[in-house]
Amino acid sequence: MSAQILPSILVPLVGLVFPAIAMASMFLYIEKEEIN
């Protein structure tokens, strides 16, 4: 059961969460550079 459900949850999670974290970190980095 778990072996078939896990990929269908993990793939969208990685596909959505990882880019969101990357965008957020880049946004914060740019904001930090502009303030200084």
Swiss-Prot record:
One of its GO terms (cellular component) is photosystem I. Belongs to the PsaI family. It comes from the Eukaryota. Keywords: Chloroplast, Membrane, Photosynthesis, Photosystem I, Plastid, Thylakoid, Transmembrane, Transmembrane helix. This is Photosystem I reaction center subunit VIII. It is a single-pass membrane protein. InterPro entries: PSI_PsaI, PSI_PsaI_sf. GO terms for biological process: photosynthesis. It comes from Chlorella vulgaris. The chain crosses the membrane at residues 10-30. The keyword Signal does not apply. It is found in: Plastid, Chloroplast thylakoid membrane. Pfam families: PSI_8. May help in the organization of the PsaL subunit.
